[in-house]
Amino acid sequence: MTSADYASRQRAIIAELNVASEFDAEAEIARRVEFLAQYLRSTGLRTYVLGISGGVDSSTAGRLAQLSVEKLRADGYDARFVAMRLPNGVQNDEADAQRALAFVRADEELTVNVKPAADAMLGALAASGHAFETPAQQDFVHGNIKARERMIAQYAVAGARRGIVIGTDHAAESLMGFFTKFGDGGADILPLAGLNKRRVRAVARALGGEELIVMKVPTADLEELRPLRPDEHAYGVSYDEIDDFLEGKPVADNVYETVLRFYDASRHKRALPYTMFDWPTA
């Protein structure tokens, strides 16, 4: 591809992911809190539910959610926010998760250990006669099972509390497809949409998040063979480079190539289930 081709695709992706050219953290806080409040009221439901991992994304989305239900209550609408801890056994960075909960200050906190359910599903697959090709493949699939079990737990609580499940996907993760389809990607509302990673961090900082939360190394921590593996190691590019791409800045050719490869390979993750009416005929 030529430089002009790269730039053209970059502009199209930025528009698709709704990344604004201008950014003001305080304005984004006000806009997103209002969005969350208006949406919950419009549904007639009463509760927001979100899993808190300890990272900056869930911490930021959680604090925005809590502020939105407080705004609703001040306006006379009964609303609550439930923050869920969803460890797989003992979480390696549990101290970070507890720090995040203290920052979010949710109306209610629940802890559900997903390990028994995730391990049971893996065991059931083995009992069926299914065999994985390698231990690494099994570990990867098991990691996605954990992510989906976490969403099962959140929807169970939402179903019992007249609730809506919040997701933490933002423009950088959406660009790279770095989420589990129907796991952490399977939510009802995405208050961080349109923000790249550095802007999520700026919002967290403006909300009063301490630097240990704001600058925590992002990790999905789903694979037991590679615990706490940083997202950037999986990407092969840094969040700064991804964020530059999303802000329309020029990046190195290898960054363009890597970002576009991830974006194209994960297109199906950003789409609703396909039907024959969606599939191109040409």
UniProtKB/Swiss-Prot annotation:
What are the record keywords, sorted? ATP-binding, Ligase, Magnesium, Metal-binding, NAD, Nucleotide-binding
Q: Which GO terms describe its biological process?
A: NAD biosynthetic process
Residue intervals passing through the bilayer: none
Which residues pair up as cystines?
none
According to UniProt, the reaction catalysed is:
deamido-NAD(+) + NH4(+) + ATP = AMP + diphosphate + NAD(+) + H(+)
Gene Ontology cellular-component terms listed: cytoplasm
Q: What CDD domains does the annotation carry?
A: NAD_synthase
Q: What class of enzyme is it?
A: ligase
Q: How does it assemble?
A: Homodimer.
Role noted for this protein: Catalyzes the ATP-dependent amidation of deamido-NAD to form NAD. Uses ammonia as a nitrogen source.
Q: Which family does it belong to?
A: Belongs to the NAD synthetase family.
Q: Please report the name of this protein according to its UniProt entry.
A: NH(3)-dependent NAD(+) synthetase
Annotated organism of origin: Burkholderia lata (strain ATCC 17760 / DSM 23089 / LMG 22485 / NCIMB 9086 / R18194 / 383)
Gene that encodes it: nadE
